[in-house]
Curated annotation (Swiss-Prot):
Topology relative to the membrane: Multi-pass membrane protein
UniProt name for this protein: Bifunctional protein Aas
Residues forming the catalytic site: H36
Function statement: Plays a role in lysophospholipid acylation. Transfers fatty acids to the 1-position via an enzyme-bound acyl-ACP intermediate in the presence of ATP and magnesium. Its physiological function is to regenerate phosphatidylethanolamine from 2-acyl-glycero-3-phosphoethanolamine (2-acyl-GPE) formed by transacylation reactions or degradation by phospholipase A1.
Organism: Enterobacter sp. (strain 638)
Pfam family, one: Acyltransferase
Length: 719
């Protein structure tokens, strides 16, 4: 009677929805593992789950006054991680056929993300051989019963959904010690919980995700700031988005690919969202690629119109680009204000009231954006990402990291770089954090000063950029920073050490590829291991293909919701080439992406990058990683830049060429260091060439195509 009353009351107030297969909750041995976001989670499950499950509640919670009130109505078992007998009691209950509910986090989330997962819950699942049913509670975190005050826009009665996910099992880990089995079981359950979050992510477009963020965090919440030092709220960003979207229609057609050549600025975010809301596909133009690289991009994506800014071209000294690239129409943002009519203003005002109507009909799987590869190994390729793939990568990042609305991101990597776009713009916007967009990562003195001045808590960049920031920064500049993330190139030991010694900060290294939107794996405070790039993100499948000559590891292939729709190539303009990869049996499979990177997984699933398959030399029958050669040079000369190329060799097949900006670096030094540290002598180049400055790409990485050309030109000349 009382249960029926409260069930009806909650259903009316919170519009409770129960999704999934409830039959999976009624098996012989069932362990239900929900996330924990509010004080009413237990009440919700007691009222709406079928049957009468036993609730395992941590002792610190079970002794509260409201739990005493619930005790006569539901079956409670106090859980104390320090008392093994309680774990055994839960195992017996499951073996007797009672469904048991355990909140594996053991406490209510204070970040909105998953908290630490206690090993005990995983051990119970493995020991009892239970069917594990993950359950996601969505919406309760927005109530006043959550602990997210100040992080989300709380409300009295938000809609709450209980998602029952497909059941799974958790086998007892094969480890010699009970402590290890318990720990591994906890990690396995953590993975199940993360996969559950990914499984219930909303089906949205980028524009809809912006509206959802405004609704979740509040229209008046600051979200974007640039060097004008006037932050935009979600409401103001939406207004600019509607304005730009309306005007872009006059210069393009629905479904057309339009070039964007813009700096890191608030208006750039508005142009991106404005374009996608009206069904245009922004192609992010890499202005550092030069006329040749941009010509390839324009051809591959069949771009007819490029939107840019006069002020940007002035400050960047880039006027030679529109002067030489006459095959496209150039439209300047400064001219758009003059295009606004009274009808446009009325349209914008009306759609501020009903912003969902501003989006033209489209699906999350439709093409949303085009990014271009760096061209480090040939012509730049257009990488077509859908709304789904970009938002999946953002959700993967949110699942493993605890970014909140109190964070402030410093984003200096350009938006044409996939790392800068996803991690530097979309991730903060969709987590309620504020982002400061700065137009250049090369201002090594300015960036640390802005991190200090704007109270930034999250900084990311390449190893090269982070190393320069550390050298020029005051030891107090990063006093508020809690996340420093390195990607796009291998993190150098010298960079890691200076950040630890000077600032007391641990750099978290990650790995990504443009084709995966881009983050594939990343170390986070909850799961970090030096010398690795973290674990593969939840929601992704990974496999290794054996490579002749490589004893440990193999070529990494990936499949998941964040993988691109396909390539656009210069050789076949405008035609989408879906991702495919050849499996171990030699069969071509669609949906898989071959990274071309040689990696290995350690015993805990952390990824170690060995190098690119194309960046190995075969010397006297042995495979030598070019990255190993560069690491050798970096160890002796960390202040300089080094890059390795390959030349043909009559006696050994191939030989190494080391390009360096250190005029004092000699083979004898490299050989001595290699012998001391167990590096094979084959990895020590005989041909060392000094360059005052290495050719580099816009991302800061060496231009290996240019270096290869230099080697080939010399070989041709010698011939």
């Amino acid at each position: 009677m009382l249960f029926g009353f409260f069930r009806t009351l909650f259903r009316i107030l919170f519009r409770i929805r129960l999704t999934g297969d409830t039959q999976s909750l009624q098996g012989e041995r069932v362990l239900i593992t929900p996330n924990h976001v509010s004080f009413i989670d237990g009440i919700l499950l007691a009222l709406f789950l079928p049957g009468r499950p036993v609730f395992a509640v941590y002792s610190s919670i079970s002794q509260k006054w409201f739990m005493r009130w619930l005790a006569p109505l539901v079956d409670l078992v106090p859980l104390d991680p320090t008392k093994p007998m309680m774990i055994k009691h839960l195992v017996r209950l499951i073996e007797q056929g009672r469904p048991v509910v355990i909140f594996p986090e053991g406490r209510i989330s204070v970040t909105g993300s998953l908290m630490k997962i206690y090993d005990g819950a995983g051990f119970v699942a493995a020991k009892s051989k239970a069917t594990v049913v993950p359950l996601r509670i969505e919406g309760a975190e927005l109530t006043y019963f959550s602990r997210l005050k100040g992080l989300v826009k709380q409300r009295l009665f938000p809609q709450i959904t209980l998602h029952i996910l497909p059941p799974t099992t958790l086998p007892m880990p094969d480890a010699p010690r009970a402590r290890d089995r318990r720990k591994i079981a906890g990690e396995m359950l953590h993975q199940i919980m993360m996969e559950a979050r990914m499984a219930v992510r909303p089906r949205e477009t980028l524009y809809e995700a912006l509206l959802s963020a405004q609704d979740r965090y509040g229209a008046r919440k600051n979200c974007v700031e640039d060097i004008n030092f006037t932050p935009d709220t979600y409401r103001k960003l939406l207004t600019k988005t509607l304005f730009v979207g309306r005007i872009l229609e006059k210069y393009s057609q629905k479904g057309e690919k339009i070039g964007l050549m813009l700096p890191n600025a608030g208006i750039s975010a508005a142009v991106i969202f404005g374009a996608v809301s009206r069904g245009r596909i922004p192609a992010m133009m890499n202005y550092t690629a030069g006329v040749k690289g941009l010509t390839s991009a324009i051809t591959a994506a069949e771009i007819k119109t490029v939107f840019t800014s006069r002020q940007f071209l002035d400050k960047g000294k880039l006027w030679h680009l529109p002067e030489q690239l006459k095959q496209v129409r150039w439209v300047f943002l400064e001219d758009l204000k003059a295009e606004v009519t009274t009808a446009d203003k009325l349209w914008i005002f009306a759609h501020l009231l009903v912003p969902h109507l501003a989006q033209v009909k489209q699906q999350p799987e439709d093409a949303a954006m085009i990014l271009f590869t760096s061209g480090s190994e040939g012509h730049p390729k257009g990488v077509v990402h859908s709304h789904k793939s970009i938002l999946a990568n953002v959700e993967q990042i949110k699942t493993i990291a605890d970014f909140t609305a109190k964070d402030r991101f410093m984003s200096a990597l350009p938006l044409f770089h996939s790392f800068g776009l996803t991690v530097g713009l979309f991730t903060p916007l969709f987590t309620g954090a504020e982002v400061f967009l700065y137009p250049s990562p090369l201002h090594y003195r300015v960036v640390p000063e802005l991190v200090y001045d704007r109270n930034c808590t999250v900084l990311f960049g390449t190893s090269t950029f982070l190393g320069h920031y550390a050298r020029f920064a005051n030891p107090y500049d990063f006093f508020r920073v809690r996340y420093v993330v390195a990607g796009a190139e291998k993190l150098q030991d010298s960079t890691r050490e200076i950040w630890q010694d000077k600032f007391g900060l641990r750099i978290l290294e990650g790995y990504g590829v443009t084709e995966c939107a881009p983050v594939v794996s990343i170390n986070v405070p909850m799961a970090a291991r030096p010398g690795t790039v973290g674990r593969i993100l939840p929601g992704m499948d990974a496999r290794l293909l054996a490579v002749p000559g490589i004893e440990e590891g193999g070529r990494l292939q990936l499949k998941g919701p964040n993988v691109m729709n396909g390539y656009l190539r210069v050789e076949n303009p405008g035609v989408l080439e879906a991702p495919t990869a050849e499996n171990a049996a030699g069969e071509v499979e669609t949906g898989w992406y071959d990274t071309g990177d040689i990696v290995r997984f350690d015993e805990h699933g952390f990824v170690q990058i060995q190098g690119r398959a194309k960046r190995f030399a075969k010397i006297a029958g042995e495979m030598v990683s070019l990255e190993m050669v560069e690491q050798l040079a970096n160890a002796l000369s960390p202040e300089k830049m080094h890059a390795t190329a390959i030349k043909s060799d009559a006696s050994k097949g191939e030989a190494l060429v080391l390009f360096t900006t250190d005029s004092e670096l000699k083979r004898e030094q490299l050989l001595h260091y290699a012998r001391e540290h167990g590096v094979p002598e084959l990895a020590v180049p005989r041909d060392i060439r000094y360059l005052k400055q290495l050719p580099v790409l816009g991302s800061g990485k060496p231009d290996f195509v240019a270096l290869k050309s230099m080697v080939e030109e010399e070989e041709h000349h010698d011939a």
